[in-house]
């Protein structure tokens, strides 16, 4: 396998006397697929937020592609595609319009953004929903669009936080197939 792209060293997060994350050590190499498993409240989402540079650890370090996420969170965010548990889109915009907006925020030209948006809508099985406003999308459709939103900036690392939550069993199977 390749170089280490995610390195957590003694990562800890405390809220007062409560320890949400307790000295995690983790190394993930390029090309690996890794899952954080545990019950509700185990610190999975908190760990992800620290990896993204959105929450500062109490102690320990996070390096993403060799960059410290606490001291350089914007640079880390440029390299990561993140799909949160509850995906948010502009409900009055179509799927492609939301994707193009994300692409523009990431410095992708209008021409390339439009091309990639249409390609990704097809890839995630939403090619027949091009004119539909995302406010009318089902939960499964929003998750699919969320995956397209993650992929449009061609990230080095993809982090998914409970990507199949609230999706019916058939939809879960379809979503897993999209990830392959």
Q: Where on the chain are the PLM-derived regions?
A:
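Conserved ABC transporter NBD signature motif
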Residues: 60-68, 75-76
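Conserved ABC ATPase signature
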Residues: 133-137
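Helical segment within the ABC ATPase nucleotide-binding domain
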Residues: 173-180
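Conserved ABC ATPase "signature" region
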Residues: 100, 104, 111-129, 177
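Conserved catalytic motifs of ABC-family nucleotide-binding domains
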Residues: 154
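Catalytic Walker B motif of ABC-type/P-loop ATPase nucleotide-binding domains
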Residues: 158-161
């Amino acid at each position: 396998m390749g170089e280490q792209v995610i390195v957590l060293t003694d990562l800890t997060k405390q809220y007062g006397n409560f320890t949400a994350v307790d000295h995690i050590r983790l190394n993930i190499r390029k090309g690996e697929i890794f899952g954080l498993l545990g019950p509700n409240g185990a610190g999975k989402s908190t760990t992800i937020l620290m990896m993204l540079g959105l929450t500062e650890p109490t102690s320990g370090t996070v390096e993403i592609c060799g960059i410290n996420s606490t001291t350089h969170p914007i640079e880390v965010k440029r390299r990561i595609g993140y799909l949160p548990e509850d995906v948010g889109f502009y409900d009055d915009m179509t799927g492609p319009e939301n994707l193009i907006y994300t692409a523009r925020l990431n410095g992708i030209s209008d021409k390339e953004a439009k091309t990639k948006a249409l390609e990704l809508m097809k890839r995630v099985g939403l090619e027949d929903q091009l004119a539909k406003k995302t406010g009318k999308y089902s939960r499964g459709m929003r998750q699919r669009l969320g995956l397209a939103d993650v992929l449009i900036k061609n990230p080095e690392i993809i982090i998914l936080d409970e990507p199949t939550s609230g999706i019916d069993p058939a939809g879960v199977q379809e979503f897993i197939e999209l990830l392959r």
